[in-house]
Every structure is written in structure tokens, then in C-alpha cells.
Amino acid sequence: MKLITNGRLITRDASAQGYYEHGAVAFEGTKIVEVGEEAALRAKYPGAEIIDARGGVIMPAFINAHTHIYSALARGLSIVGNNPTNFYEVLDGTWWAIDRHLMMDGTRASAAALYIDSIKQGVTTIFDHHASYGEIPGTLHTIAEESKRLGLRSCLCYEVSDRDGEEKCLQAIQENADFITECEKNKDPMLAAMFGGHALFTISDKTFDRMVAANNGRTGYHIHVSEGMNDVYDSLQNYGRRPVQRLQDHGILGPKTILGHCIHVNAAEMEIIKETGTMVVNNPESNMGNAIGICPVLQLHKRGILLGMGTDAYTNDMLESLK
């Protein structure tokens, strides 16, 4: 038994006491046994190992519902000649340029950096959307090794896209399928898989069909949706459907699927998201940084749509994004 003591405890339990000025948490292994006043728990568990919170706040940890390990080491990076004037140029000139050159050692180092900083920021669970088109096979397994080594919960996927050609696209699809199988086999409670897709403007109908076939209903999808207006324009011009409608056509939506951003969704799309029980993740700091708009979180919330928050790897500090 262990006791976390010497801290102000926020339980977020509306049915009981939500705050203790001098609180403590008793836990054993991975299970929280009891929370309450420090003096009472010290008396109840006299032999417990004490973990001193040093006057800090003891509270439930954060879940980062959308981030990108591949960009963990890019903070402060300047690419010569890259002066983007719109969102597509940000992607093409910065992030795609980085992930095309990311090899396995870079992926491992990026994972370690993001996980360590996440721990420091009170994040214990991440939903990562990875891309390393320099070296694809085995990358999710490598990230999972770092996740287990550092003790975080992770739900991982690989970003499928047509942008670097069919061979790379097929490798990305296979990487998702292989990692889903690995998670099914190992049944590790700290590790899970989703099927990743970049965004609708870089995924053809043929590729969506291949993704659905490879997944075979085993898990949900994690995909960027209407992050920029280019995603909406491309979908309407090339497929005659808005992005959420197109996802519905391919059977991508559902209670196990995460839609990142959803900035430029209309009322009809919101209703589809609600009806299918799909989750939306807001990434406010990233949205402001890329000057692409604001996710209509209040409208989504009023419709009863499940919402989460992510950092999009702009930071690992969830409180900073919450501001």
C-alpha cells in the first residue's frame, strides 16, 4: 500500500467531497483504494509507503486525446525557405517535410521526449497519431516499447495518407493492421490501437476502402476532419460530399472513432456525429497557432456530442491549452 500525502486533493467527485485541504490518496498497484483526509488515511494504513506531494495539488491525471509524437523534437525548428502563408503550406513545408525524413531512431527519441514531458505535465494517457514516412514498418511497436518503459497508457495509430504514393500508403495501412493484431494478442491494459488516417483531402475513396478492409471492424479510427477549409473544399469538389458525410459513407464513424479538430463542420454534420456517437477532440492552441479557426465546442456540447481535448503536440501542458 502507498499513500500520496501533503497535498491539496481535488477528487472531482460530485457525489461526495470534491476537495480536501489536507488530502491523501491510498493506492495499491494500479488501483486507487481510498481518498480522504490525510490524518485519517495515515491512521488507517500505518504501514503504507509515503509519497510526499510537497504541498502540491493531487488530482486526476490528464488525457491528451490528440497528439503527434513525430513532432516532439521539432519545437523551435526553422526550415530554410519555408515561409507558409496558409495551412496547406504549413503541412507541406513543415510537418510532411519532417515526417518524410523520420527514421526508427528518430521515432524512438521523439516518443521518449514526448512521454517524459507528458509525465512532467500530469498527463498519463495519450492518443497518438503518428507519421514517419522515412521508415514505416514497426514504428508503432517501437513507440509502444517507450510507452511501457516510461509507464504511460497509450492508444496508438499510424497516419494513412496518399500523399507519398501508393507503396507508402499500403505500408501505413499494414502498420495499423499489424499493431491492432499485436494489441489484440498481448491484451496489455496500458496499450491500445486505433486505425489512423491523415485527413480526407489526402485519402481517396480507394484508400478508405482499403483501410476499412484491413481494420475489419476491430477498432475505431483516428482522423483529422475539417481542420482547414481546404479539407471541406476538396471533399465537395472531388466527391460531392462534405467531410463528415464522406466518412459516414465509408463506415468510419462510430463510438470508437475520434475526429480531430472539426472546426469547419456544419449543423448537418454535427447531427451525423451525434447520431453515430462519434467523439470530437478540440485542439485550441494548435488551431490558434495555425490560424485556421475555432472548433464550435459549445454547439457540439449542446448536441450531446462527446468532447475531448488534445494538444496536437504544440505542447504537452494540458492546462496551457485549456487556457
Q: PLM features: residue spans?
A:
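Histidine/acidic-residue-rich catalytic or RNA/ligand-binding cores of hydrolases
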Residues: 229-241, 269-274, 291-300, 315-323
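His/Asp/Glu-enriched, well-ordered alpha-helical/loop segment
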Residues: 249-256, 298-323
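Alpha-helical scaffold segments that flank or form the walls of functional sites
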Residues: 77-129, 134-152, 173-187
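Active-site gating loops and adjacent loop-to-helix segments of metal-dependent hydrolytic enzymes
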Residues: 73-107, 164-165, 229-256, 276-279
